[in-house]
């Protein structure tokens, strides 16, 4: 936000304790905190973003890819432009792992 390129940040966090812990360190920035489960949060129709990044998973597991697909479906309507970006923590790694799992399944079963 301080660089002039980013005008605001919205954080959706399930834990109010985490918000209370982190927010004082960023009070001078234009950050909006929403205490909610991002998987259940219903954004307003006019809520639009240039960049969305999700890192809600406590561990790295290919099961997370299903959540990523669901989030992409929900949030695609909230992209500010066609070039707006949706990213996920460890997505590329998990996609590669899924390919390896599929190769293993077909080879040994």
Residue spans for each PLM region:
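Glycine-centered flexibility motif
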Residues: 36, 55-58
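S-adenosyl-L-methionine
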Residues: 14-47, 51
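C-terminal substrate-binding/active-site "lid" region of AdoMet-derived donor-dependent transferases
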Residues: 45, 51, 58-109
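Conserved SAM-binding loop of SAM-dependent methyltransferases across substrates and taxa
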Residues: 1-6
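Conserved SAM-binding motif I beta-strand of class I
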Residues: 8-13
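A structural micro-motif
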Residues: 7, 29-31, 84
